Curated annotation (Swiss-Prot):
N6-lipoyllysine: modified positions: 65
Pfam families the UniProt entry points to: GCV_H (PF01597)
GO BP term, pick one: glycine decarboxylation via glycine cleavage system
Gene3D superfamilies xref list: 2.40.50.100
Protein name: Glycine cleavage system H protein
Record-linked InterPro entries: 2-oxoA_DH_lipoyl-BS, Biotin_lipoyl, GCV_H, GCV_H/Fam206, GCV_H_sub, Single_hybrid_motif
Organism, scientific name: Shewanella amazonensis (strain ATCC BAA-1098 / SB2B)
Assembly: The glycine cleavage system is composed of four proteins: P, T, L and H.
Keywords carried by this UniProt record: Lipoyl
Gene designation: gcvH
Length: 129
């Protein structure tokens, strides 16, 4: 069973989002998602300054098994990307909720967070797969 931290919010498409102290949000993929994908070999990140909409594909995680689109859980402006993933995509596998984050976003509509899942809701999504 995958680790699902209770302090995060989740999208049914297997992204997590965490609010930071400065009001921005960090986005990554869940431990469950990286387990399904297997060993990461390449990550394509959005550009800093990109504007993304909730549900829009904005990054790609490529593993030995498949390439998978990564979706923005909320709308906003990309303010940082995890450049460490360019040289070390395996961080997504080893630390999905920490050093394996994908990008940070400055939200344009925080009410979109209300449509995301809590840990229990995300577990239910996994159980239905």
């Amino acid at each position: 069973m995958s680790n699902i931290p209770s302090e995060l919010k989740y999208a049914s498409s297997h992204e997590w989002i965490r609010k930071e102290d400065d009001g921005t949000y960090t986005v990554g993929i869940t431990e469950h998602a990286q387990e399904l994908l297997g060993d990461m070999v390449f990550v394509e990140l959005p550009e800093v300054g990109d504007t993304v909409s909730a549900g829009e594909d904005c990054a790609v995680a490529e593993s030995v098994k498949a390439a998978s689109d990564i979706y923005a859980p909320i709308s906003g402006e990309v303010i940082a990307v995890n450049e460490s993933l360019e040289d070390s995509p395996e961080l997504v596998n080893s630390d999905a909720y920490g050093d394996g984050w994908f990008f940070r976003i400055k939200p344009s509509d925080e009410s979109e967070l209300d449509s995301l899942l809590d840990a229990e809701g995300y577990q239910a999504v996994i159980d239905e797969e």
